Design a protein with these regions (language model features):
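Cytochrome P450
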Residues: 1-437
Length: 437
């Protein structure tokens, strides 16, 4: 049963068959946490696999807390690090969670997103236009630039410093996938003075004195990012998320973890969803042809992509008291982990759940969470997904995977991402939406 914990399992794909079997037999099951590499073993946790149970856990913070042990399966390395991590909005319970969410919610109103949509659509068009005549590209690399551009706009990060956002996100992914642990792609000659100062503060030590790897999510490993955030906040763009954070009465730790949440988590949701969604669509040619014939299905197609390829595989809660869930007695202080991928294939909610169907309605997936912690940027993510996929399927005729492609997946039990996705298309202009494939 500990297979669903091991990060290496997911390098071969989400184990949907195992999740289906467990969901039917033991929908709340105990999972061991063996040591992984240099990371020590953990105490184990309860995995929650049914859609209804997942929703119940997510909507009852009085029973299942985000704050007691944060929202990652593994606890931070020290009590001090846990205290810092708990200041993040993601790791708070009401009323503090509500207070933090109100500070940034104004950036995600329908009006604010409406003003941002044209810029996102323009960025998507520019990215696809930059490769259109090449006939092939790695869609992971191509798509990764869209959330970075979007975040730079809403956070007020100068264009010259955007690549820092990529490096910070990569280093956090490196917590489980070593290919990303030492990302350093920002060009010092292109950075602003703030960016160059931050780059000089980048930690170079990758192990602790006792030989354990430094947790790339820790405060010590992200000193450059936090220094940059504080410096940029001294001259924020009016109306930006950073300006709202500066003026919102946040403590220094709350400010830093909020910046982390946008710069890293806000990046990875779209960065994982776009390649995963396109890979899923191209793997179902009949559904691709249907979308080409009926472009009005793009919005429900995006929802089905999110159901089929949730960008985040799980989140953790901690029981605040002894409680029963699906007939299982959970003790106070035990870890409870909701599995989005399992809930999204629950046959009691989704008829024929393993079938990819862009006309599926309703589509009550939990890829953006549920309850108080429903993703504040969910609509922004949807706008980006629709903008990029619209450009790809209308401007890259004959789109397909490069023959023989076996996409490399992240070795992560938390993020559902691809490392590479080679795609190809016809260079000459021709068929777009409105004709077949």
């Amino acid at each position: 049963m500990n297979r669903i914990f091991l990060p290496g399992t997911y390098a071969d794909g989400v184990p949907y068959e195992l999740l289906r079997e467990l969901r039917g037999a033991v929908p709340v099951c105990w999972v061991q946490e063996p040591a992984v590499g240099a990371w020590p073993a953990g105490p184990g946790y309860w995995a929650v696999l049914r859609h209804a149970d997942v929703r119940h856990v997510l909507r009852t913070p009085e029973l299942f807390s985000s704050h007691l042990g944060a929202t990652q399966v593994r606890d931070p390395d020290s009590a001090a690090e846990l205290q810092f991590t708990r200041t993040m909005m993601l790791n708070q319970d009401p009323p503090d969670h509500s207070r933090l969410r109100r500070i940034v919610a104004g950036a995600f109103t329908p009006r604010a997103l409406g003003e941002l949509t044209s810029a996102i659509e323009r960025h998507a068009a520019d990215l696809v236009g930059s490769v259109r005549e090449h006939g092939e590209a790695d869609f992971v690399h191509l798509a990764a630039d869209l959330p970075v551009r979007t975040l730079a706009v809403i956070m007020g990060v100068p264009e010259q410093d955007r690549q820092l956002l990529v490096d910070w996100a990569n280093r956090v992914i490196g917590y489980q996938d070593a290919d990303y642990a030492h990302s350093s792609t920002a060009d010092p000659d292109r950075l602003t003075d703030l960016g160059r100062t931050a780059l000089a503060l980048r930690p170079t030590t990758t192990t602790t004195p006792d030989g354990r790897p430094v947790n790339p999510r820790s405060r010590a490993a992200l000193t450059d990012m936090f220094a940059y955030a504080h410096a940029l906040a001294e001259r924020p763009r009016p109306g930006s998320v950073l300006a709202r954070m500066r003026d919102g009465g946040l403590s220094p730790a709350e400010f830093e973890t909020m910046f982390f949440l946008f710069a890293v988590a806000g990046n990875e949701t779209v960065r994982n969803s776009l390649p995963g969604g396109l890979y899923t669509l191209l793997g179902h040619p009949a559904q691709y042809r249907l979308l080409m014939r009926r472009p009005e299905l793009l919005a429900p197609a995006v929802e089905e992509m999110l159901r089929f390829w949730p960008p985040v595989l799980h989140f953790r809660r901690t029981a605040t008291q002894d409680v029963e869930l699906a007939g299982v007695r959970i003790r106070r202080g035990e870890k409870v982990v909701v599995h989005h991928a399992a809930a999204n294939r629950d046959e009691t909610v989704f008829p024929d759940p393993d079938r990819f169907d862009i006309t599926r309605t309703p589509n009550d997936h939990v890829s953006f969470g549920y309850g108080p912690h429903f993703c504040v940027g969910a609509q922004l993510a949807r706008i980006q997904l629709k903008a990029m996929l619209h450009q790809v399927i209308t401007r890259l005729p004959g789109l397909d995977l490069v023959p023989g492609t076996v996409p490399a997946r992240l070795g992560s039990n938390f993020q559902n991402g691809l490392k590479h996705l080679p795609i190809q298309w016809q260079r000459s202009s021709g068929c777009g939406i409105g004709c077949g494939r």
